[in-house]
């Protein structure tokens, strides 16, 4: 059922067109500077960042370093006073809000309850696409029947058993999945998330991670801000460290966490003397099994 949404995204991956250098990236920030007041210190300082199409990219770093401000620049809530931002090669300044938020950019808020409007999960989902009637609208310009679109998103985000519940009665993880479902109904090519695992348990983190990886595999580009290093190491393709308004290092996630003394995982801290490249529990188990197999073969 989730194919209704994912097949459209998968088609983007299969296009074999020649693209300009700008168009190779879903997100490209060039030399961006931003401050909240004219004479106040810069929060974003000469920031350059490139994220490929279909990539799941995580940003980690301390509070107040400029991570959330960067998301606000990407979502056009604020604008840099110097530098440029491009989405799939197009200057962000040229986007109209309607174009940007209907089919291009999706923003998952830190507080999912801020976007709940109706008394049941199902009605809340339909509210995103202009209600149940199958008629063309600005909220729902595609030809697929709304029921099929809802069905696909519900399957993808695993909401089947929750459709008659009030959104406020859901657990933290369930609310996060509902918020994600609402954002995905707008068919974004790029998904921005601020601390999506905050306040949810490991079971729901795993479910969320699997959903995000599936979206990434089908061409959706994901930029996530997080303090959850375990989640980043497990699911993100690349991780960058934000410090004093800029990304100071950016590497493939396993390499990032394996070579980091401060931003690393519990598994890496415990096992790095024996398995320095292991950053998740699964990595450690795999390394132990491999060592045992090699010992037996000898």
Model features per residue range: what roles?
Residues 1-25, 263-298:
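ABC ATPase nucleotide-binding domains
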Residues 60-62:
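The feature captures the beta-strand-to-loop junction immediately N-terminal to the Walker
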Residues 75:
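Helix-to-loop junction immediately C-terminal to a conserved catalytic motif
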Residues 83-91, 101:
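Conserved ABC transporter NBD signature motif
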Residues 141-162:
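Conserved ABC ATPase "signature" region
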Residues 166-170, 174:
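Conserved ABC ATPase signature
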Residues 191-194:
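Catalytic Walker B motif of ABC-type/P-loop ATPase nucleotide-binding domains
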């Amino acid at each position: 059922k989730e194919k209704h949404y994912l097949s459209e995204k998968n088609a983007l991956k299969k296009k074999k067109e020649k693209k300009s250098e700008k168009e190779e990236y879903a997100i490209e920030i060039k030399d961006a500077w931003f401050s909240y007041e004219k004479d106040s210190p810069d929060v974003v300082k000469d920031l350059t960042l490139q994220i490929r199409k279909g990539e799941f990219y995580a940003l980690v770093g301390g509070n107040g370093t400029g991570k959330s401000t960067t998301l606000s620049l990407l979502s056009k809530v604020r604008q840099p006073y110097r530098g440029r931002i491009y989405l799939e090669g197009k200057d962000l300044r040229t986007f109209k809000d309607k174009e940007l938020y209907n089919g291009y950019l999706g923003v998952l808020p830190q507080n999912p309850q801020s976007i709940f409007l109706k008394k049941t999960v199902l009605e809340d989902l339909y509210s995103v696409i202009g209600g149940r009637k199958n008629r063309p609208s600005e909220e729902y310009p595609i030809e697929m029947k709304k029921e099929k679109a809802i069905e696909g998103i519900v399957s993808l985000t695993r909401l089947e058993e929750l459709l008659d519940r009030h959104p406020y009665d859901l657990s933290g993880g369930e609310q996060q999945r509902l918020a994600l479902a609402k954002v995905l109904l707008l068919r974004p090519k790029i998904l921005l998330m601020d601390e999506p695992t905050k306040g949810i348990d490991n079971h729901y983190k795993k479910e969320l991670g699997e959903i995000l990886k599936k979206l990434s595999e089908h061409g959706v580009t994901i930029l996530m801000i997080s303090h959850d290093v375990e989640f980043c190491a497990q699911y993100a393709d690349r991780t960058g460290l934000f410090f004093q308004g800029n990304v100071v290092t950016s590497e493939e996630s396993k390499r990032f966490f394996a070579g980091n003394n401060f931003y690393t995982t519990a598994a890496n801290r415990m096992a790095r003397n024996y398995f320095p490249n292991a950053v998740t529990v699964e990595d450690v188990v795999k390394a132990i099994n491999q060592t045992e197999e090699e010992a037996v073969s000898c």
